[in-house]
Amino acid sequence: MKAAVDLKPTLTIIKTEKVDLELFPSPDMECADVPLLTPSSKEMMSQALKATFSGFTKEQQRLGIPKDPRQWTETHVRDWVMWAVNEFSLKGVDFQKFCMSGAALCALGKECFLELAPDFVGDILWEHLEILQKEDVKPYQVNGANPTYPESCYTSDYFISYGIEHAQCVPPSEFSEPSFITESYQTLHPISSEELLSLKYENDYPSVILQDPLQTDTLQTDYFAIKQEVLTPDNMCLGRASRGKLGGQDSFESVESYDSCDRLTQSWSSQSSFNSLQRVPSYDSFDYEDYPAALPNHKPKGTFKDYVRDRADLNKDKPVIPAAALAGYTGSGPIQLWQFLLELLTDKSCQSFISWTGDGWEFKLSDPDEVARRWGKRKNKPKMNYEKLSRGLRYYYDKNIIHKTAGKRYVYRFVCDLQSLLGYTPEELHAMLDVKPDAD
């Protein structure tokens, strides 16, 4: 006699539970304590969050937030972050880091954006920001008709959002077409001083502008306080701005003075507007639709050399090319790595760890760890090291700003048109700094 076998199908019910997003770390939690997102978990998170993101539409309508995040004001950005914090019960979000326009926020790129918030939290916010940008993609009109954007978005913020800065924080490995700029292309098309002037906001996000400059009791440094007015081709000479004083102890070494210079130069560029802005993207530098280049038709009058000629405070026992002054001259906002390197290279006291080799614009990092430490101090990033610094240098390869010298360790060369920008030949700088040709 055979035993009866129960072949009835069974239904297994899996209980689902809401993800506890309060597990997100606080800002003071070490990164090592936070598990990294894997590609598969990121994909699952992306799919799970898309439906929830749709709830932001009602919030946009209620608060009058534009659909295009590149048109957001600082208030809109704050409202968006606050909505996300409440919607997902996010923890550890520092709202001060998001004090910027939507255009500046979108221009950061993923790598820099993720530095604004703890792990997981930054991924959620970035995912939503990307979706919002893709939902509001609008084609440019090139037949003479004006685009549908409001006139107000042709300010410098609009320039930032659709300019070359939009690609600044994306390392070459993240491009979907990594070979869209070849070595031969770089050789045949060196970056011009005008293109160099257009590069902004790479490797860092804009700092919050201080209302009152820091007060210290030593070394005075001039700065320019720019009035909130439209810069036309006739009044773009930066020397027309009113002058003030900013005190800064050990101004080329202290973190506080670095931050104040960043904020002042950020104020300089963010309060400007370019009537002559090239509104239709140019693809001369990039053959990729997500990274259009937009350049102003006019650059500041004269060279940097002319700009600092009458400023005696910049000529005595200081770098020939202070990064803060160069950032102010170019209107680049926060100090950029290439500007910082030029400051160190034109400071005699730094020749023990970074110096010109004597061969044109070639330079060597004799102590790369010290260079990285100072860059981290300048940007208030104590975890900065040479590995991270070198990633920033590699980013410059495709931009034709800096190239690595083949066969030489820690040796690089500026390949952009520095002479037109600075007004100095490399030989002039070498003579001023008593540079002896490298024996290697």
Swiss-Prot record:
InterPro entries with a match to the protein in the record = Ets1_N_flank, Ets_dom, ETS_fam, Pointed_dom, SAM/pointed_sf, SAM_PNT-ETS-1, Transform_prot_C-ets, WH-like_DNA-bd_sf
Q: Give the consequence of mutating S251A.
A: Decreased phosphorylation, leading to decreased autoinhibition. Strongly decreased phosphorylation, leading to stongly decreased autoinhibition
Gene Ontology molecular function: DNA binding; DNA-binding transcription factor activity; DNA-binding transcription factor binding; nucleic acid binding; sequence-specific DNA binding; sequence-specific double-stranded DNA binding
Recorded hits in CDD domains, A to Z, give:
SAM_PNT-ETS-1
Q: Where in the cell is it found?
A: Nucleus; Cytoplasm
Residue ranges of the region described as Helix HI-1: 304-312
Q: Give the record's free-text account of how this protein's activity is regulated.
A: Autoinhibited by a module composed of four alpha helices (HI-1, HI-2, H4, and H5) that flank the DNA-binding ETS domain, reducing the affinity for DNA. Phosphorylation by CaMK2/CaMKII in response to calcium signaling decreases affinity for DNA.
PROSITE patterns for the chain? ETS_DOMAIN_1, ETS_DOMAIN_2, ETS_DOMAIN_3, PNT
Q: Does the keyword DNA-binding apply?
A: yes
Transcription regulation in keyword set: yes
* Residue positions, PTM N6-acetyllysine: K8, K15, K305
Keyword entries, A-Z? Acetylation, Cytoplasm, DNA-binding, Immunity, Isopeptide bond, Nucleus, Phosphoprotein, Proto-oncogene, Transcription, Transcription regulation, Ubl conjugation
Question: According to its UniProt record, which protein family does this protein belong to?
Answer: Belongs to the ETS family.
UniProt protein name: Protein C-ets-1
Q: Which organism is it from?
A: Mus musculus (Mouse)
The gene is Ets1
